[in-house]
Amino acid sequence: AKALVKAIPGSGIVYAATVRTAEAVHEALKQAGESVGLYHGRLPIAQRREAQDAFMTGELRIMVATNAFGMGIDKPDIRFVLHYQMPSGLDSYYQESGRAGRDGEPADCILLFHHRDRAVQQFFLAGRYPEAKELDDVYAALCSNPSDAGPWTLEALQAELRAPRNKIQVALAVLRQRRVVRQHADGRLSMLRADVSAEDLASMLDLYREKREQDQATLEQMVFYAQTGLCRWEVLLSHLQGKAPAQRCMTCDNCRRIAVHTAQAQESAAVDCTPRPSDKAASI
């Protein structure tokens, strides 16, 4: 990433999928002497705003960020967008890459891909949707009294069930959506219905199960884009518009590689067709 960033003049954005990776890349570029800022959702609002303003005014050349950086970003002279890790899908990739070259001048959109990037997105996907057992456990706990005699809260559920926080959060989201539980402003949880059957709980997951399958397909399409040998613009437009362009873009890495191989093959064929001295003698 350092070599790519140094090779491209002008301002740019480096996207990472996780906060930890964003911080590591930011530190590496900073140590390399780059003018670089950091932006992710765990930073204080004031610090995020300061970094964004410095990037927009040109005080910082590079912004390393998670997908939290994007809304309202319209800097016309961004010369590159580098995805250090693969995003969750082509829509996100297109939107984030589309921040480059808005002034109409050439810009580079680069995706670095490693197989472990898929595992990162798969981890996020697994944490986004509850399993039946997790929903059952949260509901059963809410129907009982907390062991510490206090009100149920997210923290109390996490301590009681010893389950990941994000799993409990998504289970609570399902129950809130179906008006089974209410979460008050102070974090307290109160039951609105205590007569939900196991069958009803299972049916609540149907919509989430369908959405999960869609998100899984979206991820697989992103992996296909990263690994394909086809014209990347063709793959992207096929996803966005439902049909491929009539011609290849001739600017992506795959098209350029095909063009080089074609030119080499044509040159080799031309050399093979050139009569050799022995051929000339034989033909006389």
Stretches found by the model and what they are:
Residues 1-143, 149-158, 173, 181-196:
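Helicase motor core with emphasis on the C-terminal RecA-like subdomain
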